[in-house]
């Protein structure tokens, strides 16, 4: 699955309980994916997204948080449209929902940015704004020299609101206009990783980080002359770096780490140059490569989230240039 789709699928499964956070996410999704239309004298809201799971999440939130019914319309692929699109449409209660979510102000005028209640909300609300905006119109490219996380915005006001939400999370994002389209872009790898964590895309983050580490190690290895086994060296470097991150994760979490994650982490630390296959065989009972990798991913994600909450360095703090250069 492409990185963008994997992030959106994971975010669509995220279980959020707090009402204000769900409202912030819905407001952002409708702002960045939606539009207001007048049909037969009624205000109708339509939000077009690229995944069925995103459409289902939005429809459920509209019903559970605001009590309004909506329908999902599938626009099949064809012509210039390479993939199916999904339109969430609210007809009967369109005007009420538009006012509740801040698409319209108290006088019934369209709001171009985000409602003040969302803009001035908590850090969790800011995370929800980014989650909703990314689900609506976000993309994540492969890590590398041109890697980026970006959101296409309906206008400069919403772009500035999204930059402001990022700033409340101590994340630097830039608003740009490219060929008449407003976008908010993040290019720094560490900043992308921090935002994925704040949005709740922990599994996708681990995939992205693994690919990022692999590319960094590969770039370093390619500069080494007359080395007969570059692939083995890259794997060993990546394993050592992963071991250092796990070591830091165990330090951050202390006694709060679940036993099964702690066991996988201790295996990684004890055998820093072993492959995932080898780690699985060393486990008792024996584990598959995917099982050991999944536990390590969850351990690192949990530690990085804790580090963000505490304002301390995350698991990358233990990865030194020497681990990649040797």
From Swiss-Prot:
Pfam families with a match to the protein in the record: HTH_WhiA, LAGLIDADG_WhiA, WhiA_N
Domain of life: Bacteria
GO MF, any single term: DNA binding
GO biological process: one example: cell division
DNA-binding region location: 275-308
Keyword Ribonucleoprotein attached: no
Family in the record: Belongs to the WhiA family.
Signal peptide: none
Keyword list, A-Z: Cell cycle, Cell division, DNA-binding
Source taxonomy: Bacteria, Bacillati, Actinomycetota, Actinomycetes, Micrococcales
Name of the protein in question: Probable cell division protein WhiA
Function of the protein: Involved in cell division and chromosome segregation.
Species assigned in the record: Pseudarthrobacter chlorophenolicus (strain ATCC 700700 / DSM 12829 / CIP 107037 / JCM 12360 / KCTC 9906 / NCIMB 13794 / A6)
UniProt keyword annotation of Ribonucleoprotein present: no
